[in-house]
Amino acid sequence: MDIGQSLGEIALFKGLPDDQLSDLASIALIKRYHRLSTIFSEGEPGSGFYVLLAGRVKIFKLSPDGKEQILHIFGPGEPFGEVPVFEGRSFPAHAETLENSTAVYFPRTEFVSLIKRNPSLALNMLAVLSRRLRTFTVLVDNLSLKEVPGRLAAHLLYLSQHNQGTENVELDISKGQLASLLGTIPETLSRILSRLSKQGYIESDGRHIRILDRTALEELAEGIRRL
């Protein structure tokens, strides 16, 4: 695998000249994980961060009674565990693979040294952190201010937006994982999907969802409409 070429195709490193990509490749370590492997646990020292090349990874917190709250699910090309790189602190959550996965690992000390020498790399990291902050702001808003139907509607619209605005979306995680991501339980999620279908807002066939009434979903997501 040509690490430098692979890094150049990742949004985080887009636009960097070849010499900077070579510098990144020189400190990068390829790590491969089987499905359901722990990459790091909450409280472990944040000694570096990762960029996913293949597979999917969930970031989650555990309550004292063991209940899981999924914070984010990352796919190929996305960085994770990057906040401790700048803070020099421990990982604030757990990371586990959902399928066989390959990631590039960047040790904190070496990466920070590269950033100090390369302002363009620092700007790219700042853009990533800004997007991540917006994502978690939406998550907090959804969990604290919206009812479950609104959270689900917002998630379906998010999937549509990230699939070029198509009306057909696919749930790429299990309903149990989606329920955790939305802060509910699988039984409640199934009931809401059924109600959305009966109202004519969506068609549901397993993991395949077709949006029939985008306006209704938008109003649900915004709290204007109730299910």
Predicted segments with their positions:
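Cyclic nucleotide-binding regulatory module and flanking cytosolic helices
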Residues: 1-30, 34-35, 79, 84-85
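Cyclic-nucleotide recognition modules
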Residues: 72-127, 134
